[in-house]
UniProtKB/Swiss-Prot annotation:
Assembly: Forms homodimers and heterodimers with PHETA2. Interacts with INPP5B. Interacts with OCRL. Interaction with OCRL may be important for endosomal morphology and function.
PANTHER family, per database record: SESQUIPEDALIAN, SESQUIPEDALIAN-1
Gene: Pheta1
InterPro entries linked: Boi1/Boi2-like (IPR045188), PH-like_dom_sf (IPR011993), PH_domain (IPR001849)
Domain remark in the UniProt entry: The F&H motif, an approximately 12-13 amino-acid sequence centered around Phe and His residues, is essential for binding to OCRL and INPP5B.
Residue(s) carrying Phosphoserine: 183
Protein name (record): Sesquipedalian-1
Residue ranges of the region described as Disordered: 134-189
Matching SMART domains: PH (SM00233)
Leftover remarks: Was named after 'sesquipedalian', an unnecessarily long description of a simple thing.
Recorded family membership: Belongs to the sesquipedalian family.
Locus of motif F&H: 191-203
Amino acid sequence: MKLNERSLAFYATCDAPVDNAGFLYKRGGRGAGSHRRWFVLRGNILFYFESESSREPLGVILLEGCTVELVDAREEFAFAVRFAGGRSRPYVLAADSQAALEGWVKALSRASFHYLRLVVRELEQQLAAMREGSPANALPDANPSTVLNPKPKENGRAVWSALPEQPAVAPRRPPLPPRRRASAANGPSVSFAQLHERYGLEVRALRNQWRGGLTSLEVPCHPGSGETQTQDQP
């Protein structure tokens, strides 16, 4: 893997918060002693410096595919960072105290992306279980026929509603005019001329009443039937 040294140096010393930092004893090669170095953990990258005030790291350890375990060593509070594969040598480190040892082991064990993926997967499963068992996510109407009804768009986005659609109310028809009192259904058939004369008399009678010319007028209901209808002035 090729890494940009300048980018790594900037990332190691930037002002962003670190996941863990402190002094650890790092063992060198075979037969070499341990050196006290300043370690900084950012994400899945472990930097180590010669001192806390150093601006450039001495080395970088990429924490992917590794395991962190306690080891028996001449240093107290020692642990090792091991990688899969026989060619990769373990990094043996030692803390100053038991609390520092536990803090570093916990932080390094949780630094890899593999661990983060497992955590995200577990959280997704818990969230899905909470959503399935939460009554707040149920629809207001338990009727299985209830469907989401699309509403007109607002600002280019469709607004949906889980409430059942209210039935449309048909407009009322205008009231029918009152029927005239007539016995035409039972009486003899009336010609068009007779109907014209009858309704003409009614119209003239109403006009005269409106003008105040007449007080009453007898209008035959059916011409030739002998029956009459009296209209009184209101």
